A protein has these predicted regions:
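Substrate-binding groove of N-acetylhexosamine-processing glycoside hydrolases
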Residues: 1-198
Length: 198
């Protein structure tokens, strides 16, 4: 923590210990990372966003929630930490992961409510699920590195003419969504991102 943030607040040290023994330390090899269902095409049984990822969750949601709480406590206790780009990035990224994992489990609650036929419970569960997505978008908007607009601007800067800029914009959007614009799309969402505005 000290090397990355210039200080080592206890809540962050504890958060990093939890992450080091959990999400940062998979018990077996897997191809790709565990992906957020928020980035996936809508489905009742979604477990991953891309066509090639395993979609396996090898860590407990409670671990990432503990780590997120540690980062949030440190940010609350020492507001100057949030001014450090490295801390802010990690804070947003860890809380984002906690929200993404919560959404995975919340979708199961939505499905269960749908299957039960109880419309009131279903609406309540859907509202919670959509709230997680809104909360994530608001969180991601707090750091420019998690903004779709930042990605788009960088891509547009590579083009000189209007046509080049249009091509760069299209290519940049394809890279983080469909990957290719042909059928079959065996690499759909290969490089999916959780960014505000996407």
């Amino acid at each position: 923590a000290r090397q990355r943030y210039g200080s080592a607040p206890k809540p962050v040290v504890k958060a990093l210990e939890v992450l080091s023994s959990s999400i940062y330390n998979p018990v077996r090899s897997q191809e790709g990372c565990t992906e957020s269902i928020i980035c996936a095409r809508p489905s009742w049984n979604v477990r991953k966003a891309s066509t090639w990822s395993s979609g396996e969750r090898y860590y407990h949601l409670g671990d990432i929630v503990k780590a997120a709480r540690g980062y949030l406590k440190a940010a609350n206790d020492q507001p100057n930490l949030v001014k450090k780009e490295t801390f802010r990035y990690d804070l947003v990224d860890v809380v984002r992961q906690a929200l993404a994992d919560a959404a995975f489990y919340q979708l199961q609650q939505v499905r269960s409510a749908f299957d039960s036929g109880d419309l009131a419970v279903y609406r309540k569960q859907v509202k919670r699920f959509l709230s997680l997505i809104s909360d994530m978008d608001a969180l991601l908007a707090t750091d420019s590195q998690f903004l779709l607009g930042t990605w788009q601007k960088r891509a547009l800067d590579w083009g000189d003419s209007r046509q080049e800029k249009a091509l760069m914009d299209k290519s940049a959007k394809m890279l983080i969504t469909t990957w290719i614009d042909q059928v079959p799309r065996s690499l759909n969402d290969y490089s999916n991102r959780q960014w505000a505005g996407l």
